[in-house]
A protein has these predicted regions:
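Divalent metal-coordination and catalytic microenvironments
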Residues: 2, 40, 101, 147, ...
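C-terminal cap of metal-dependent C-N hydrolases
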Residues: 174-180, 185-186, 201, 250-298
Length: 310
């Protein structure tokens, strides 16, 4: 069908019921088709090293590339553990094909699950089917209004989505600074009041972490969100400015580019982005979308090879 590979969310039902061996067998079907496996690992908290080993094992035994989605160390008990996880990833990269991405925030976003709130210092509701009026509000405030403990209030809101403040800034910066990490948003566009990463991820890296914090040079920030991603996913003739390559171009002012989306007001466009071109046609110009839709699906037969320059 032209698929690049397959992804798993072993943290979530029903995928969490799948044993490692089942994922390995699925992965073996990708081997002869140059496919890859991306994963939201089974545990990004207390058992994160076990989950890393599971991910590496899937890649080794299926003989396929694996990409760790939005690598993080979640929960207060795990703050600082990126100093432990990154050397493990580095060692695995010397033996097999491993990639990873990261988003530039200390908060994650997914379904609201009362049983998985304990490691978060703050929970922000992004949507709720029975109580849509609470989208964008802190769970603690909602619970006080309801006269209920937060866990019981969360039950009343289900099904719902939430932002969880559960990471440490030191880990976010360390993972972003790691030479092999790609930048990705992990954005969820359907949420009523989404995580600001949907609008702010890439300008936040360029403006805040590169220019203001000095985490890495601008050129490295750009590489992490363009050329490195193209190499890791085998996107042939994309990711670099080169004669003959597809013209996917963002023109921005390095002195002013910055995210303006916040958790309080998450759907705000960045400043300093002058022009966005996709496949040679402008899609954003003069502060507004042009209405042109030149994007297209990239099928497997058009791809390059994971881990090699294209």
């Amino acid at each position: 069908a032209g698929a690049i590979g397959f992804s798993t969310g072993l943290f979530y039902p029903p995928s969490q019921a799948a044993p490692t061996e089942e994922v390995i067998e699925l992965g073996k079907a990708l081997h002869d088709h140059a496919g890859l496996h991306t994963t939201h690992m089974r545990d990004e908290a207390n058992h994160i090293t076990d989950s890393l080993e599971e991910t590496f094992r899937i890649g080794r035994e299926a003989d396929i590339p694996v990409v760790i989605s939005h690598h993080k160390c979640s929960g207060a008990d795990n703050h600082g553990r990126s100093a432990e996880t990154l050397p493990l990833i580095d060692a695995a990269m010397k033996k097999q094909r491993v990639g990873l991405d990261v988003y530039p925030y200390i908060a994650s976003s997914t379904m609201l699950n009362p049983q998985r709130m304990m490691g978060a210092s703050r929970v922000l509701v992004t949507w709720s089917v029975p109580h849509p009026e609470h989208a964008g509000r802190d769970l603690d405030d909602i619970a006080k209004e309801m006269g209920l403990p937060p866990l019981e209030a969360a039950e009343k809101l289900l099904p719902a989505g939430a932002v969880y403040f559960s990471m440490a800034e030191e880990d976010v910066q360390r993972i972003m600074q790691y030479p092999h990490s790609m930048i990705g948003s992990d954005g969820l566009p359907h949420d009523t009041r989404p995580h600001p990463r949907l609008w702010g991820t890439f300008p936040r890296v360029l403006g805040h972490y590169s220019r203001e914090v000095g985490l890495f040079p601008l050129e490295e920030a750009v590489r992490k969100m363009t050329g490195l991603s193209a190499i890791q996913f085998g996107l042939k003739d994309r990711g670099t400015l080169k004669v003959g390559h597809y013209a996917d171009i963002v023109m921005f002012d390095p002195a002013t580019v910055i995210d303006t989306a916040s958790f309080a007001d998450p759907m705000q466009p960045a400043t300093g982005i002058e022009l966005v071109i996709v496949n040679g046609r402008p899609v954003w110009r003069d502060g507004a979308v042009t209405g042109t839709r030149p994007g297209r699906a990239i099928r497997r037969q058009q791809l390059g090879t994971f881990g090699k320059a294209v």
